[in-house]
C-alpha cells in the first residue's frame, strides 16, 4: 500500500545446537538479489551476546522478484569453537526471503549444528 514503509526489518535468533546455547559472534552476510541476477551485499554482521541480529532493509525499489539472502557462516563458527572435528561438508547455511508480503518485520530463528540446521518463520504479519 502507499502508506507501507519502505524500511523492513529482518531478524534472527541463532542457537548453537551442539552446546545448547545462543550462537554468539556468528558471522552473517546479507544480500539483495535482483531478478536480473545481480547479488548486492547489504550487510555483514555478527550475532550479539544473545545470538541475535537485526538488519534494516530499504525495499522501496524492490519488485515482486526481489529476494533477500542470509548466509550463516556456521562452518567458520564451529571451527572457531573447536566443534567441527567431524569435518562436515556443510559450511554455510543460506536462507532466501521474499519480503513482498511482509509489512514490517520478518523473524527467522535458526538452530545450527555442524551437520544440520532447522529454521522457521516467526512474524506478526502472518
Where are the regions that the model predicts?
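Compositionally biased low-complexity segments at domain edges in trafficked proteins
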Residues: 102-126
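Short, Lys/Arg-enriched N-terminal segments with co-localized hydrophobic residues
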Residues: 1-6
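Beta-strand-dominated extracellular/periplasmic modules and repeats
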Residues: 7-100, 107-109
